[in-house]
C-alpha cells in the first residue's frame, strides 16, 4: 500500500507533468483515468504487510503470540484486518486528492460503493501475499529491500498508461496483470474513462476478473501464510 502522502505526489507528477502527453482510450480526462488506477495501486501494494510480518518474526512477536491459547490463523487474520482498515484511510485520501483535481464517480453512489468494496476485498487478499512473503523472508531489512521487486508489478499494468501502446509481448503481460484488471474494474464502476473496446478477457470483463483474482489469492495464500506462521 502506498504511504498516505504518496497519492498526492503521484497525482501531481503523472496528472500534471506527464498527463498532457498521454491519450486515454475513447477520449476523456487523463487525471480521471489516473486516479482510478491509483486506487488499484493502493489496493495491490503488499509491501507494508510484508515488512510488518518480517519485523514481527525478527523481534520475536510471532513466538510470543504462538505461546498464547489462540488459533494459529488469528494473528495473520488480525494483521490482514488491520491493514485493510489502514487501506480505507488511504482510499479516502486518494478520493479527496481525486476530487481536488477534478475526478468524479460518475455512475452514482451504489457503483462507487461497489468499486470501494472490490478494492478493499482485493487489498485484503493481497495482504495475505505480503504476510506469507514476510514470514518467508524472516528479516525486516531484507523484506524492505525486496520491496523494490514489487514495483514492476504496478508499472507493467494499465495504471499509468493504456496497454494498447505497448509492444505485443509486453501488452500480453500487462493485460493479464491482476492490477490491470482491478484498475479497469475501478474505472468501470466509478464511470471513469479508459475502458478498452477490445483486448484481453480480463480488461473486457474487469469486475469478474478482479473477483476471480481475489478468490484465487485467498485460496492460495491464506493457508500458506497460516502454515508459515505456525512454523515461523
Regions found by a protein language model. Give the residues of each.
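Hydrophobic alpha-helical transmembrane segments
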Residues: 1-30, 232
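Hydrophobic alpha-helical transmembrane segments of multi-pass membrane transport proteins
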Residues: 6-15, 30-101, 154
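Small-residue-enriched core segments of transmembrane alpha-helices in multipass membrane transport
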Residues: 8, 34-43, 113-128, 148-155
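Alpha-helical transmembrane segments of multi-pass membrane transporters/translocases
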Residues: 11, 15-16, 187-232
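Short helix-capping/hinge motifs at transmembrane helix termini and TM-loop junctions
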Residues: 14-23, 101-106, 135-139, 161-165, ...
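Transmembrane helix segments
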Residues: 18, 134-180
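Alpha-helical transmembrane segments and their short interhelical loops
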Residues: 72-147, 205-223
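Terminal transmembrane helical anchor/hairpin motif
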Residues: 161-205
